[in-house]
UniProtKB/Swiss-Prot annotation:
EC number: 6.3.2.2
NCBIfam families recorded: glu_cys_ligase (TIGR01434)
UniProt family annotation: Belongs to the glutamate--cysteine ligase type 1 family. Type 1 subfamily.
Name under which the protein is recorded: Glutamate--cysteine ligase
Source organism of the structure: Vibrio vulnificus (strain YJ016)
Disulfide cross-links: none
Biological processes annotated in GO: glutathione biosynthetic process
Length: 525
């Protein structure tokens, strides 16, 4: 079956009639980075007070660990604003870190023992304690090392004018159904061809040997001092060594419709795990995990892309989707780009604009479990050996087998058309330039981020030395930066407000933690 069909051109023509559509994409970035100390080791200090409450600051929080910062931009419709806001957040954060720096890549710096990794703390409220307990569960299930691998998440949505162009006037119910159906079509095409993202932008071909710490691996690593690497790898972060989850391989969550997806997710959070039950849930009065199901909560589901809707207060992600349908998608396959202080570049954003729009406008057949397994196989090949020229990928269980290069050129033939239309809407040639640059990378794997980073690591003698050198340079750049979109006053105001909000949440608690958890998980009964 030929998966790149001509319907794309017809749909593109419809949308292109209103050029404003291409100026109204909604975008947001979430960037994770480890705080580290002078000697290139993970910071053991608590979240800096000058950053406010990690629980309630809308721009600066923490992920798994107390030392794992997460920066969240507001949604914007302009790429310069998006990246400028990310710059501002980095600048303010660095001013509050003293001598500490931000680790500039996905794979962590040197970690002597897992005990050095303190779980993120959010205060004394029930909801804060639940967040930390969820992390305790992750630690016991998968180990802390896997959880401190950093990534970049890219949130993306189409404007209403996009749907108007494709479907004309619709009732609210029809529009909700149309959007959900189209976003799931996008998600299926992302599974089919999204391996382009780790091919181009994967930036974790190597890791510190301390990261393995007794874990077995069948991957044929080569050693450079204390650094282990795979010569043709693009993203170890997305490999079985990184943030994937074998316990979840029993789950069969489909992407053919919102109903199928929600049904699969609902089943997953109710499926008991014999393996996790052995860990115990509450032993000697102390909680070890939220529950012993395959997923403690929905967020534990590993996925390279997620359908999303902003949840109302107290609403679970699936409840928000069931209520209002898909509002935007979250791309979760980006490694931290080590060649920029903020972890993502304008070229990457432009490629994601093009690729996600193409994935939404292209034909997207339903996928069965066999086909899903096929896509996973392609992704696994690309993350472990994607720079092996001529690597063969099979699109679809019974589909064609072609080289990565042949598939990529097929996709780019249509991305180029889209880039021209989007450039014409903006009155420049920026999308075409991004397209041309990346198309060269298809036949020149040495231009990809993973290849550039591996060369640098080999020149410097180790991943640690490379990270420290880049981190030092970015610290200076971040400190020298001048606010472009936020102001110091806005940043300080958010810090103060976050502390007030945390205190209010703590004072509003009316039940003990046991009761709170029982109430939260009542829906599982």
């Amino acid at each position: 079956m030929n998966f790149i069909l001509t319907d794309f051109a017809a749909r593109l023509e419809l949308v292109a009639r209103n050029p404003e559509v291409f100026k109204q994409f909604g975008r947001g970035v979430e960037r994770e980075t480890l705080r580290y100390s002078q000697n290139g080791r993970i910071a053991t200090s608590m979240h800096p007070q000058g950053l406010g409450s990690a629980f309630t600051n809308q721009w600066i929080t923490t992920d798994f660990a107390e030392s794992l910062l997460e920066f969240i931009t507001p949604v914007s419709h302009d790429i310069d604003v998006l990246l400028g806001q990310l710059d501002d957040i980095h600048h303010f954060t660095q001013t509050q870190l003293g001598e500490e720096k931000m680790w500039p890549m996905s794979m962590p710096c040197y970690v002597e023992t897992e005990d050095q990794i303190t779980l993120a703390q959010y205060g004394s409220s029930n909801s804060a304690k639940m967040k930390t307990l969820y992390r305790e569960g992750l630690k016991r299930r998968y180990g802390s090392l896997m959880q401190i691998i950093s990534g970049v998440h890219f949130n993306f949505s189409f404007p209403e004018s996009f749907w108007d162009a494709l479907h004309g006037e619709q009732t609210a119910e029809e529009r909700q159904a149309t959007k959900s159906e189209a976003y799931f079509g996008l998600i299926r095409n992302y599974y089919r061809f999204g391996w382009l993202i780790p091919y181009f932008f994967g930036a974790s071909p190597a890791m510190c040997s301390s990261f393995l710490q007794g874990r077995e691996t069948s991957l044929p690593f080569e050693a450079l001092g204390k650094t282990l690497y795979l010569p043709k790898a693009t993203s170890l972060r997305l490999s079985d060594l990184g943030y994937t989850n074998s316990a979840q391989s029993v789950l069969t969550i489909g992407f053919n419709s919102i109903d199928e997806y929600l049904e699969g997710l609902s089943k997953a959070i109710r499926t008991p795990s014999a393996e996790f039950a052995k860990l115990g849930v509450k032993e000697n009065g102390e909680y070890r995990q939220l529950n012993s199901n395959v997923l403690q909560i929905e967020n534990e589901l590993y996925a390279p892309i997620r359908p999303k809707r902003v949840a109302k207060n107290g609403e679970k992600p699936s409840e928000a989707l069931a209520r209002g349908g898909v509002e935007y998608i979250e791309v979760r396959s980006l490694d931290v780009n080590p060649f920029t202080p903020v972890g993502i570049t304008e070229t990457q954003v432009r490629f994601l604009d093009l690729f996600l729009t193409w994935a939404a406008l292209s034909e997207s057949q339903p996928m069965d479990q066999c086909e899903l397994a096929c896509w996973r196989e392609n992704w696994n090949k690309v993350v472990v050996s994607g720079r092996e020229y001529g690597l063969e990928l099979q699109i679809g269980c019974k589909g064609e087998k072609l080289s990565l290069q042949a598939w990529a050129h097929r996709v780019f033939a249509e991305l180029r058309q889209l880039a021209e239309v989007m450039d014409s809407a903006h009155g420049d040639n920026q999308y075409s330039l991004a397209c041309s640059e990346l198309e060269q990378w298809i036949d020149h794997p040495e231009k990809t981020l993973s290849a550039q980073l591996l060369t640098l690591i080999q020149q410097n003698g180790s991943l640690g030395a490379t990270g420290c050198e880049l981190g030092r340079a970015y610290r200076e750049q971040n400190l020298a930066h001048h606010y472009r979109h936020f102001s110091l006053q806005q940043m300080e105001q958010e810090v103060a407000l976050s502390l007030i909000k945390q205190s209010q949440i703590e004072q509003a608690d009316e039940v003990d933690f046991d009761t709170y958890l029982a109430d939260y998980f009542a829906y599982l009964k």
